[in-house]
Swiss-Prot record:
Gene Ontology MF: a single term: ligase activity
EC number: 6.-.-.-
Signal peptide, first to last residue: none
Coiled-coil regions, chain positions: 408-442, 468-513
Record function comment: Involved in bacillithiol (BSH) biosynthesis. May catalyze the last step of the pathway, the addition of cysteine to glucosamine malate (GlcN-Mal) to generate BSH.
Claim: tRNA-binding is one of the keywords in the record: no
The protein's name: Putative cysteine ligase BshC
Alphabetic keyword roster: Coiled coil, Ligase
């Protein structure tokens, strides 16, 4: 397995993320810890074990063991779930929405980063560090999670659920699996080449989709949810790595979070002020664009009513559902409801990272560019809720290079820099290089001759009759049109003669940079079909963890 850095690739075009990776002094006021320094992990560990974390370890560990068992996780994950009940154990956390076919590959790379960094820090700190994947089961952005791209030869194909999700506000963990999942699996199977691994991968896709609910049978009518399918697939993909899965909609975890919800309801003013201070620092002091939309009077909480996840607002003693003033409570009534029925509440983007630190002794969080920016707004929110922000580590970036793609690169003597940044220009250069007849030059020379000879002819005609100027000009335009048409026909034939090479360039683009980076477009599952269900475990074990950040190509 050969690994090579890809030059010129950024985690994000955001100036804030670029500064986070390479100009720490500029962003330091917004975060608690410098992710590049081992001292940060040591200080964070000392903070957590010295009283900074006071969560119910036994209850969290029991809930996670039960949930992972329901997902079919292996003994390595179950043992790690139990380890979280021990007082010295720390957590390494990442997370993502529950996408179909495990979503874009960067979800996989977030987990890979977390597992490998957890192993490193466990060795360096001398304590167990358990990798945890936070499945955002409470999320209701169905449009974002209902589709994914897969490579298909020289093209990319979009696979999507056929249901319409306009206005859908049920959480992905609490709604029955969409019926079109079966058709989507069939379509995926048809697109995949026949390999020795295909039958096993497709069979597991189907089995994971029809298993019983992993969380609340009542909420989904006894059917599995999209989050269940995602969790079972992820547990299968990461078997042997010790990755523990957490579903944010787990009623057992909600019960542990009840005091957190009550505090958020009681300290709305403090949280609002802290969030405003973070936004002000981010925009005015640091000069970055804010990535969180602030809603006046927001409690940064949702409430579930008739299965729908609805945002809460509050002012004074009154709390109500945004856009539904008929659904209102006194603040004390809602605090009481949160303590009695915490499963009816969930956090928004502002409090989600904070509740993570309430539940888990999180040494660090591995995030993508958007999350890095979110965390930069929340240092004071953590403090307002009696917590402290963990070390925030950027996820690793990868592109998988298959053997046929590597052969095309080698055949055309292309570097990764060429393939990622100059492919269109090099494609045109190939056409020009293979043009042994000099098509472009021949037509350019002919045009020059034509312009000169036509001008001479026009002068003669206009001497005969100056009123023929319009006819002369129309004649010139018609002849130019025919010349252009003939040139295009010649170029088309030339491209046809170069078709094999051009198809290879198209294949490079479709596989390496499909509408952007591969990791943001493709699911990992097509690569499991081709290279085996244990591919991700092999990547976890064999790809070295780098200091700093770079985007790397992995030659399979």
């Amino acid at each position: 397995m050969h690994i090579e850095r890809v030059p010129g690739i950024a985690l994000s075009p955001s100036g804030a993320v670029a500064a986070y990776l390479g100009d720490w002094a500029r962003v330091a006021p917004a975060y608690e810890y410098d992710w590049r320094r081992q001292e940060s992990f040591e200080r964070r560990a000392a903070y957590l074990t010295g009283g900074g974390y006071a969560g119910d370890r036994a209850a969290v560990a029991a809930a996670l063991e039960r949930y992972n068992r329901a997902l079919g996780a292996d003994e390595a994950s179950l043992e790690n779930a139990r380890l979280l009940g021990r007082p010295e154990t720390l957590a390494a956390v990442t997370g993502q929405q529950a996408g179909i076919l495990t979503g874009p590959a960067y979800s996989i790379y977030k987990a890979m980063t977390t597992i490998r960094l957890a192993r490193q820090q466990s060795q360096r700190l001398g304590v167990p560090v358990v990798p945890v994947f936070w499945i955002a089961g409470e999320d209701h952005d169905w449009h974002e999670v209902s589709w994914v791209m897969v490579p298909a030869g020289n093209e990319t194909r979009r696979l999507a659920l056929s249901e319409r999700f306009d206005g859908e506000r049920r959480s992905v963990a609490l709604a029955p699996m969409p019926a079109s999942v079966s058709d989507l699996i069939d379509e995926f199977a048809q697109l995949m080449p026949d390999t020795e691994f295909k039958e096993e991968v497709i069979a597991h896709l189907r089995e994971a989709a029809v298993g019983g609910p992993a969380l609340d049978p009542e909420a989904t009518g006894g059917a599995p949810s999209l989050a269940d399918w995602f969790g079972r697939l992820m547990a299968w993909v990461f078997r042997g790595t010790g990755l523990v899965f957490l579903n944010s909609s787990d009623p057992a975890l909600r019960r542990i979070e009840a005091p957190f919800f009550a505090r958020a309801l009681q300290q709305q003013a403090e949280v609002e002020a802290a969030c405003a201070a973070g936004v002000d620092r981010w925009e005015r002091e640091l000069g970055f664009a804010c990535t969180v939309e602030q809603t006046p009077n927001s409690l940064n909480l949702f409430i579930y009513i008739d299965g729908e996840r609805l945002p809460l607002l509050g002012e004074g003693d009154r709390v109500w559902v945004r856009g539904r003033p008929d659904l209102s409570w006194s603040r004390s009534e809602l605090v009481d409801l949160a303590l009695r029925s915490p499963e009816r509440f969930s956090t928004n983007v502002v409090l989600r990272p904070v509740v993570q630190s309430y539940l888990l002794p999180d040494l660090f969080y591995v995030g993508g560019p958007g999350e890095i920016s979110y965390f930069g707004l929340l240092r004071d929110v953590y403090r307002a809720m009696g917590r402290q922000m963990p070390v925030v580590v950027p996820r690793e970036g990868f592109t998988l290079v298959e053997p046929p793609i590597a052969r095309i690169l080698q055949k055309h003597e292309l570097t990764l820099d060429d393939a990622f940044h100059r492919l269109d220009d090099l494609r045109q250069e190939l056409l020009e290089r293979e043009d042994r007849l000099g098509i472009a030059q021949a037509f350019a020379s002919f045009r020059q001759d034509f312009e000169r000879r036509h001008a001479e002819l026009a002068a003669l005609v206009l001497q005969l009759d100056p009123g023929l100027g319009q006819v002369v000009e129309e004649n010139r335009r018609q002849i130019e049109h025919q010349i252009n048409r003939l040139e295009e026909k010649a170029k088309q034939q030339h491209r046809k003669n170069c078709e094999t090479a051009l198809r290879q360039f198209d294949r490079l683009k479709a596989n390496l940079t499909p509408n952007g980076l591969q990791e943001r477009a493709f699911s990992i599952l097509p690569y499991l079909v081709k290279y085996g269900p244990d591919l991700v475990r092999r990547l976890v074990d064999e790809v070295p963890l780098e200091e700093g950040w770079s985007h790397r190509a992995i030659y399979l």
